[in-house]
Amino acid sequence: VLERSLSTFVDHPRIDGVWVVLDSADPRWDSNPYARNPKVYRAAGGAERCHSVLSALEALLVQAHPQDWVLVHDAARPCLRLEDLNRLIEELEQDPVGGLLAVPVRDTMKRGDPSGRVVATVERAHLWHAYTPQMFRLGALAGALREAIAGGDWVTDEASAMERLGHRPRLIEGHADNIKITRKADLPLAQFFLAQQGRLE
């Protein structure tokens, strides 16, 4: 899964480098073919997603400019389409804030209570599923994450950190097959989508 996700970014002509955030004791990374790729770097993971992302950004700030764009992507999303990645970059490279790939909500949404009872039906107009990659300026995103963590708000995506500071990230519509593999049952679905995209050998 990691190799599939990495290939999309490592092979992209407009991406200068890729930072992989892993547990410092991860035993499998050294056997990954990308471990020796000169375009790929490694950073230590943290307690939560926001800490891990900030770890990579802090390392990147040593060698990149704060105004450089960064893309943050879930390694568990190997089905990202190249066309979606290209659209994200092209649509946002002149944007003052940045943004993220997202998909409009099409299902009926319910809000529940702790006992599992419906409290309300949520109007789905203008609701979006937040996907990755999410694209922001390096310095701005690092600062937003530092501020969120210092405030005890362990945001679950980068856009949320930017929103806390009053920014309004742009939503770039992507494809719904950019799924996140979180359960074993997701693997066959990811394989199906990759086959449909012609990316399974």
Each PLM stretch: what is its role?
Residues S24, P104-D107, A176, A185:
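Glycine-rich beta-alpha junction loops
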Residues R49, A75-C79:
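Acidic metal-phosphate-binding loop of nucleotide-sugar-dependent transferases
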Residues C79-I172, E201:
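Conserved core of the sugar-phosphate nucleotidyltransferase
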Residues I15-V18, V97, D177-N178:
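Short active-site oxyanion
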Residues V70-L71:
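Short aromatic/hydrophobic "clamp" motif used to bind/position activated sugar donors
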Residues L2-Q67, G151:
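Conserved N-terminal catalytic core of the sugar/cofactor nucleotidyltransferase
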Residues N178-E201:
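Hydrophobic helical membrane-anchoring modules
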